[in-house]
Curated annotation (Swiss-Prot):
UniProt xrefs under Pfam families: DIT1_PvcA
Mutant phenotype after disruption: Disruption of the gene maintains the ability of the strain to produce the pyoverdine siderophore. Disruption mutant cannot produce paerucumarin.
Functional description taken from the UniProt entry: Involved in the biosynthesis of paerucumarin, a cyclized isocyano derivative of tyrosine. Responsible for the synthesis of the isonitrile group on tyrosine using the C2 of ribulose 5-phosphate as the source of the carbon atom.
Similarity comment: Belongs to the isocyanide synthase family.
EC number from the UniProt entry: 4.1.99.24
Keywords, ordered alphabetically: Lyase
Species for this entry: Pseudomonas aeruginosa (strain ATCC 15692 / DSM 22644 / CIP 104116 / JCM 14847 / LMG 12228 / 1C / PRS 101 / PAO1)
Protein name: L-tyrosine isonitrile synthase
InterPro entries: Isocyanide_synthase_DIT1, PvcA
Coiled-coil portions: none
Lyase is among the record's keywords: yes
The gene coding this protein: pvcA
Length: 328
């Protein structure tokens, strides 16, 4: 067991992360949080300490920010908005807080994964490219100097196929993906695997409920269940590639993770849904803070659209509705 004093630099860094940890909601009552933290410490403290002992910036990677959901019941439109802006600002501020007590600081590489599974989530490559370009511009606009971006087309070994997005996906699958049957077996073998599979299935089902969808909900659900295996296969392949590209980096995740995982699940905005992300929701200005919600939920509460520079940005809730939407 890795033992480390509570007042050491690695422990202080981990405490910053723990403030925003994504936990499985199903585990909140059944698992001891103290026991979970002890298990997290055993995994993460030695990895954080390795950077500090070398006097280097602590390196994080975060597979995230693929593209906006195609469902207008969840998001404003296809462009990054206040939800992304606040999330990127949070990530940059997290690095700044670490730098207050550890001078070399930290850096986070956002590994945008839209290109990885865009065909499976039925978002076109042109939309993914536009989202990625807007995301880079947003990072510059907010002065997020601690954040970098890495995409599938940035992999040096794939450089010859940089403009052939389908071939890039095939190179990823061929080099890093496990067989689909193996993915199925792994997911069905644990509670965490089932939770992930159900969450991805739900995302795909909800994203498919667009105004122009003409099929039955049963057919869409069946299709989402099948595509979910492929999305997870690609996501895990992307993770394996990132482990090659950033072998020492601490892996952050937008999903809840087991306490003994190498991945650390992190919230970028307050939300009642531990699976909701900025690209599946909208930013909502309540009485005292911004929270993340689905657009349809905000509209039911009477949310008022706010535009910035002529573009839809976020929603504002009346005081009474804001109290109903309060996030614990």
């Amino acid at each position: 067991m890795y033992a480390i004093a509570e007042d050491t630099l690695p422990a202080r860094v981990l405490k910053e992360l723990l403030l925003y940890r994504r936990r499985y909601p199903e585990h909140r009552q059944s698992a001891s949080e103290a026991d979970e933290i002890r298990r997290i410490e055993q995994v993460q403290l030695p990895r954080i300490a390795a950077f500090i002992e070398a006097g280097e910036p602590i390196e994080f990677v975060l597979p995230a920010f693929p593209a906006k959901s195609p469902n207008p019941g969840k998001v404003l439109d296809s462009r990054p908005d206040m939800a992304e802006r606040l999330s990127l600002s949070f990530l940059n501020h997290l690095c700044q807080r670490i730098q207050l007590f550890y001078a070399p600081g930290a850096k986070i590489t956002v590994c945008s994964d839209g290109r990885v599974f865009g065909d499976l989530v039925r978002i076109g490559d042109a939309h993914i490219s536009a989202y990625q370009d807007a995301l880079r511009l947003m990072i510059e606009e907010i002065g997020a100097t601690h954040i970098g971006v890495f995409n599938l087309e940035d992999v040096r070994a794939f450089e010859a196929q940089r403009d052939n997005h389908e071939q890039l996906r095939q190179l990823l699958i061929g080099g890093y993906a496990e067989p689909l049957e193996s993915i199925r077996e792994t997911l069905l073998a644990s509670e965490e695997g089932l939770l992930l599979y159900r969450a991805i299935t739900r995302f795909l089902y909800e994203d498919g409920l667009t105004p122009d969808y003409q099929g039955s909900k049963t057919a869409l659900q069946r299709d989402a269940k099948e595509r979910a295996y492929g999305v997870i296969q690609r996501s895990w392949a992307w993770g394996a590639l990132l482990a090659d590209q950033f072998p020492r980096a601490i892996r952050l995740s937008i999903h809840p993770q087991p306490a003994d995982s190498l991945k650390f699940g992190i919230h970028m905005m307050p939300t009642r849904d531990d699976w909701l992300t900025p690209w599946h929701g909208v930013a909502v200005n309540t009485e005292d803070r911004f929270v993340l919600m689905k657009r349809s939920e905000v509209l039911e509460l009477g949310g008022e659209l706010v535009q910035i520079n002529g573009q839809p940005s976020h929603y504002r809730l009346p005081a009474r509705a804001a109290r109903r939407a309060a996030v614990a």
